[in-house]
Amino acid sequence: MSAMPTDRTDQTMFARIPKLKSAVLGFVWVLLAAPLLIGWYVHAAATSSANAEAAYDLQPVINSENVPPLVMLVMSRDEQLYNKAYSDYTDLHEGEAGDPGVIDATYDDTFTYAGYFDSNLCYSYNSGSTSYNSASLGVQTGTGLFKADNAATGTNSHYCTSEWSGNFLNWLTMSRLDIVRRVLYGGLRSIDSATQTVLERASIPNDLHAWVKVYGGSDVASLTPFSYDASNPVSFCNASIYSGSGVPSTAPLMRVVRGNYSEWSATQDSQCNWHDTDGDSNNPSMSSGLGSKEYTVRVDVCDETGTLARESFCRQYTNTTTGVSTYKPAGLLQQYGEGGKMRFGLMTGSYADPRTGGRLRRNIGLFAGNGSDPTTCTTGDEVKLSDGTFCNQGAGVEGIVNTISRLKLVGWQSTTDGSSSGWKGD
């Protein structure tokens, strides 16, 4: 059973996600990722001179150098944000020259898939690495993470040798909510310190929000550590296993097995289970899993040592007191908010106030730098400018990052009809 829906969204919203080539395209990307409405509010001081006023009116108000644009993000809390980002029933190349006009029903190496992995890097997986911090926002325990090793090769710079392609991992693992988080502020961090950053996929209930992707392309050995078998593709099932109390009891998982298990996420009850767990003969046994069998979908990004490959979406921060530089995954909020070029706020729906237009989660204001000391977090700061770590992430604290990072589906249990499902928080 699936969690009860709220607002409806277009099923194809996330099927085509363009590259960030400019600020405008970046905001369009966010609009495609989720039902966000961006309101632009610009005010300017009037002058007493009629001639000056006439000259002022000759150019758009947005061009004023003295008044930053004020942006209010209005975001729906829709359960469809937890669906897969890449639906595999859309023409990804629609409108491009030479487009054959057919549906791209599987991975397409000529397309760059956005997500927490750099599409042009190769990743290894370490099953024993610590990938969470107990102080992070509601993350679950569990070890294992991906880490970039080197640059990818091939015609499209997406191929690897005995490793995971970042482009392929984005296609496999990303949900719609992950794309929203990635575009806005770099992604959900399960570790956020001055020396390490680990991003993790959204918590996906193992109801019908879970998804499986089956890939049998002859280049599978260039995209994964697994060999090609013409008669046996590889199935990848994505979910977080929910407990009897209706909350996730595991870290975000990707389970991998040899064979075509296209209905692994379409069973009568809970999804992405091993046969050993539920006794369903249609599900694969854990012993037949490939590699680590279960992969925690967390990735250690923005290598601080400088010895390994570093993702292209990492932003450099320098502590002016110590001279130490750190790197953090960043999005549009950091790009336009940290220097005060734009001011941001956020409103979302609320179950506590369902008929009053939702709640103001963050009033429009400076995203960072509200105090005089960049090495400390001041009220209103969402990023510490000296090292890029997030600020003010406590429960009930206003903030765009804090609010969106805390969104989570809870209440679903495979033993109920799903009537108690809903959103975490108010």
Where do the model's predicted regions map?
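Divalent-cation-coordinating short motifs within acidic/hydroxyl- or histidine-rich contexts, strongest
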Residues: 44-426
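Alpha-helical interaction segments
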Residues: 19, 30-31, 158
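A subset of signal/propeptide-processing and intrinsically disordered low-complexity segments
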Residues: 2-5, 38, 52
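Bacterial N-terminal signal peptides
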Residues: 26-40
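N-terminal secretory signal peptides that target proteins for export/translocation
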Residues: 1-24
